Amino acid sequence: MNWGRAPGVLLGGGATLLLSFLWMPALLPVASRLLLLPRALLSMASGSPPSQPPPASGSGYVPGSVSAAFVTCPNEKVAKEIARAVVEKRLAACVNLIPQITSIYEWKGKIEEDSEVLMMIKTQSSLVPALTEFVRSVHPYEVAEVIALPVEQGNPPYLHWVHQVTESVSNSGTALP
């Protein structure tokens, strides 16, 4: 059966007209999801840089201006040392430590399984490169995991607080050691 056609095409007659009306609403969820693709993905596809999105209505928050970065550490001692340092340096407003995660990964041709501590770091998106550089400089792993995701929505007072706490670093324009 050719699933690329509307079901009414296979039936013919009056059923075609009836099913074509039923078929169109079925496409609406798919079409609406396509319209909600992040601007960054759409701009990457077109080759043009993403434009700054407008602030969320009434909150003054610019979607994506705060990021949640994730870093794995071999143990709680290392995670606490890095967490304290990034908060003291104002590279992050807050770091949550999530103990006893299990990571399964391939390393140098071998499947590994380790118990680790996951750090969830809230910072300004503009500070992610400096945060990454700092974590790489102090992390014991040969290849430290530092990944960040932009925060599109959240509690406006909290997101404002993240900006306030890290503002002096983001305005200085200097990279930290």
From Swiss-Prot:
Coiled-coil region list: none
A cellular-component GO term for this protein: membrane
Keywords: Signal
Residue spans crossing the bilayer: none
Single GO biological process annotation from the record: protein localization
One Pfam family in the UniProt entry: CutA1
Cystine pairings recorded for this chain: none
Keyword Signal in annotation: yes
Superkingdom of the organism of origin: Eukaryota
Signal keyword on record: yes
Residues annotated as signal peptide: 1-32
InterPro entries: Ion_tolerance_CutA, N-reg_PII-like_a/b, N-reg_PII/ATP_PRibTrfase_C
Gene Ontology MF annotations: enzyme binding
PANTHER family named among the record's database cross-references: DIVALENT CATION TOLERANCE CUTA-RELATED (PTHR23419), PROTEIN CUTA (PTHR23419:SF1)
Family: Belongs to the CutA family.
The protein's assembly and partners: Homotrimer.
Name of protein: Protein CutA
